[in-house]
Amino acid sequence: MHKYVTIDDIYKMIELLPDEKQNPVDETGDCLYTNEDGDHCIAGEIIRMLGYDLPDFDDFQNTIPLGELIDNLHANDFDDEAVEMLHIGQKVADRLTHAGDPLAWAMAKRDMVLFFNRSRKEEIAQRRLQAGH
């Protein structure tokens, strides 16, 4: 049984990822969760690091949308913010991979951290408002 995954868990995984990496793509240019060598895209690598199994290279699920993949993994223990944070990273890494940027993951990590920080600031502001400050 997996624990409930939050943006805090995703944030901890981001720090462990390399900067100089791109998402794997197939011969048609589709980004993959897993390539033939077993490398993963940024969202897939984080999901794997959290203890979930990813589709193999030849699995039809290898190119489905992230939300659908999480549903198929029965990973209903990902909160909405965690899924959104993964989606942000995936979108940036996919776009920069297609542009040939060797630092695709670095930029994706940056945007994920920005999302995390924004979320935390909103949470603090809401607590202050509720406390009457």
Task: Give residue spans per PLM region.
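Active-site nucleophilic cysteine motif
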Residues: 34-49
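Catalytic phosphate/metal-binding cores of nucleic-acid and nucleotide-processing enzymes, i.e., regions
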Residues: 23-29, 50-117, 123-127
